[in-house]
Amino acid sequence: MQRRLIASVLLGHYLSAFTALGIPLYLPRILADLAPDAPGWSIGVLFVLPTLCTALAAPLWGRWADRRGCRLSLLRAHAGLFAGFLLAGFSTNLSMFVLALIIQGTFGGAMAASNAYLATQFKDGDLSRALNWTQYSARLAMISGPILLGLMTAQGLGLELYRYLAWLPLLAFVMILPLPADTPRHQANATNADGPLNPLPTDMPRLLLVQFLFSFAMVVTFPYFVPYGEALGIGNDALIGVLYSLPHLVYLIALPWVQRHASNLLLPGLGLLAVSNALQFWSTQAEPLFALRLLSGAGMLLGFVGLHRCLSQRSRQGSAGRLFGWFDASGKWAGTAAGVTAGLVSQTCGIASPFLVACLAAVAAMALARPLLMTSREIPA
């Protein structure tokens, strides 16, 4: 039953994340068909709009999940994505499309909802590994989504892509329906259903700040990686795409072995991330880039595994929704801030400058993360 449960949650998350993470790359083409007179800056606004809505809504949905049930919240997330994608696919004007993106971001949030539900079914080491696998499904969607959707757009599909892909989160919804429900607060404690919820860990602000800096360090180098590669003399778009994807491929390939390690690898991961970004900032030739991207992937992998171990150690009965809601919101705010920062520093300090910013963010995360490891009890691998 446990294998079936985690397989259903992970596959459901992949199906929902496939469209959410894959289709934004093709927003310029979709917007050109839907609103050809829209200003260029509107692409950036539409790109971050669902993320901003999720960042704002995730803590509220987390609180709702703790009171009403995390499985119900997961069903809500898949249903919200289905509704948002379907409306986007039938949009006839820009206003309707914007509303669809707001619905997608506000009522979606499948990552936080999936992790919160898993936290009601697994504990300690089992939960830590489950969180690693939900991140695995996100990385897989991040790689496969743009490739497969690119093949579809090459056939002339545009806005109607949303219409067809809306059925993926609906399929995820159906897969979650037969899974066991957790015990929501209003059933577990009917005499005080509206009373105060169980408290979050006292060091939660520190954990959220480390998550913010870690996510920021990863994302800030994404937006301008193509012109960065071109500046190093790489003229092949496919090769730039491979180099861009390498860190995610490291996660997909090496996770089964790395997560068996008994100790927390968060600090080494942040250190590798800082070093790799510093070296990419100083690089003037393309030859070392392959090795440096692998090094970035190793840092990303160790960082995620370490963060998930810290998170699983702080998961408590009755607080999973808020814990993972705030954790996901922190990552979403980091992504938004990273996009803005990348645009500013690349225009003022050079196309490689986001890598220096990423290095500094990773170093700051290292300094803040040490107390998290000192206060955490070790959990079995």
Language model features: what each stretch is:
Residues 161-178, 354-371:
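Symmetry-related core transmembrane helices of the 12-TM Major Facilitator Superfamily/SLC fold
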Residues 319-349:
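A late C-terminal transmembrane helix in Major Facilitator Superfamily
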Residues 1-3, 181-211:
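Juxtamembrane intracellular "pre-TM" segments in multi-pass secondary transporters
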Residues 110-122, 302-316:
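Intracellular juxtamembrane helix-capping segments at the cytosolic ends
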Residues 2-48, 204-206, 210, 214-233, ...:
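Helix-loop boundary and gating motifs at the non-cytosolic
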Residues 101-138:
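Cytoplasmic helix-loop-helix junction between adjacent transmembrane helices
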Residues 52-56, 240-261:
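Transmembrane alpha-helices of Major Facilitator/SLC transporters
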Residues 72-87, 265-279:
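Structural signature of the two symmetry-related core transmembrane helices
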